[in-house]
């Protein structure tokens, strides 16, 4: 199989689809890998590293897309849509429930698109989303602490406080991978942390995990309102695989927050959980202020720590990439149910129910679409 690794072109996206070690594994399995010039430089992998791993370095973006399978990090941007072709396997993060134009382009060009974030194991865990959720969760608490500083628009609060001064209050909505990792860092910074989740069993696990050092609260509209309005930092970390994020924090709740408080919307790439995060921001211009509250809505947070993120992502995605390359997509889907759940579009059909519902499109199961 011929495989392409393009350079990411999203604002300040410094990750790369595969590390040199990942490329080496594919080449050793008999596949041809084309890597776009400087694709890995943002993660401090140079062209020579890929060349030594057995890749062919190409300067033309069109050439790296003229392959059997493209492995990326983030969803293609509009300038990349012309490279789509029938039968192309696209393996990357997609978040299609918030990307109608991209979804339509994938359907029109009959691309076989596999979204990292919807590959799901029998225990409902998301193995290809998990490493980036860990990174984004940990970053969210660090970023929140930074933007609480007065010079960054915040109210000038130190999350850990000092003797005789109260700690900053952090509320985390969602107790999954991102929320759990946000909690770890917020606790490490010395904050007073509350985490809300809809699952009582998960709250029990979090209470055990953190030894009673966090407040675990059932997530419902009244509790969300109560804790949001008294918080200095609110982190949104709710995910429904493949579907748009639920808008759990209303504009009225935001209006009740203190001036200079901060919200971090980790779920912004799926539409966000705050009614007031009405636009996606970038690492170049990461925040805006609305109702006196600092809003951080960067969709590719892990892109700011690309070396760590690329290596973590490569560890998770490489076994699936090898499966697709070695077996071909039909046999890979047939033999691996978790991977088949990652299929979002197949030759003109939407094969993810959450995406179909988001845009009122016709849905076909993977089995129907592939006639397995």
From Swiss-Prot:
InterPro entries: Ala_DH, Ala_DH/PNT_CS2, AlaDH/PNT_CS1, AlaDH/PNT_N, AlaDH/PNT_NAD(H)-bd, NAD(P)-bd_dom_sf. One of its GO terms (cellular component) is plasma membrane. The active site is at 95. CDD domains: L-AlaDH. It comes from the Bacteria. One of its GO terms (biological process) is L-alanine catabolic process. NAD(+) binds at residues 169-199. Its EC number is 1.4.1.1. GO terms for molecular function: alanine dehydrogenase activity. It catalyses: L-alanine + NAD(+) + H2O = pyruvate + NH4(+) + NADH + H(+). Pathway: Amino-acid degradation; L-alanine degradation via dehydrogenase pathway; NH(3) and pyruvate from L-alanine: step 1/1. SUPFAM superfamilies: Formate/glycerate dehydrogenase catalytic domain-like, NAD(P)-binding Rossmann-fold domains. PROSITE patterns: ALADH_PNT_1, ALADH_PNT_2. Belongs to the AlaDH/PNT family. May play a role in cell wall synthesis as L-alanine is an important constituent of the peptidoglycan layer. NCBIfam families: alaDH. PANTHER family: ALANINE DEHYDROGENASE (PTHR42795:SF1). This is Alanine dehydrogenase 2. It comes from Staphylococcus aureus (strain bovine RF122 / ET3-1).
């Amino acid at each position: 199989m011929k495989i392409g690794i393009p350079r990411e072109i999203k604002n300040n996206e410094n990750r790369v689809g595969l590390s040199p070690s990942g490329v080496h594994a594919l080449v050793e399995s008999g596949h041809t890998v084309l890597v776009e010039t400087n694709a890995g430089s943002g993660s401090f992998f140079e062209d020579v590293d890929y060349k030594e791993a057995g890749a062919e370095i190409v300067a033309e973006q069109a050439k790296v897309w003229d392959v059997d399978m493209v492995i990326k990090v983030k969803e293609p941007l509009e300038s990349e849509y012309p490279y789509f072709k029938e039968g192309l396997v696209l393996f990357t993060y997609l978040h299609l429930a918030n990307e109608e134009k991209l979804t339509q382009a994938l359907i029109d060009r009959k691309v076989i698109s596999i979204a990292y974030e919807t590959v799901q194991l029998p225990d409902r865990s998301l193995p290809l989303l998990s490493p980036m959720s860990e990174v984004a969760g940990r970053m969210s608490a660090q970023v929140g602490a930074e933007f609480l500083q007065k010079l960054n628009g915040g109210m000038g609060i130190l999350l850990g406080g000092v003797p005789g001064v109260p700690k900053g209050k952090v509320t985390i909505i969602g107790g999954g991978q991102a929320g759990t990792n946000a909690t770890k860092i917020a606790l490490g910074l010395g904050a007073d942390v509350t985490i809300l989740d809809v699952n009582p069993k998960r709250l029990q696990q979090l209470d055990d995990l953190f030894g009673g050092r966090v407040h675990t609260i059932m997530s419902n509209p009244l509790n969300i309102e109560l804790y949001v309005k008294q918080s200095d930092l609110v982190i949104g970390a709710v995910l429904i695989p493949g579907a748009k994020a639920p808008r759990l924090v209303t504009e009225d709740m935001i209006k009740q927050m203190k001036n200079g408080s901060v919200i971090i919307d980790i779920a912004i790439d799926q539409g966000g959980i705050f009614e007031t995060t009405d636009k996606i921001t970038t690492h170049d211009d990461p925040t805006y202020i609305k109702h006196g509250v600092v809003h951080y809505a960067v969709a590719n947070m892990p892109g700011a720590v690309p070396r760590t993120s690329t290596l973590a992502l490569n560890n998770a995605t490489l076994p699936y990439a090898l499966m697709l390359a070695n077996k071909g997509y039909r046999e890979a889907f047939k033999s691996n149910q978790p991977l088949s759940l990652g299929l979002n579009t197949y030759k003109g059909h939407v094969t993810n129910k959450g995406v179909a519902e988001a845009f009122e499109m016709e849905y076909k199961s993977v089995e129907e679409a592939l006639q397995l």
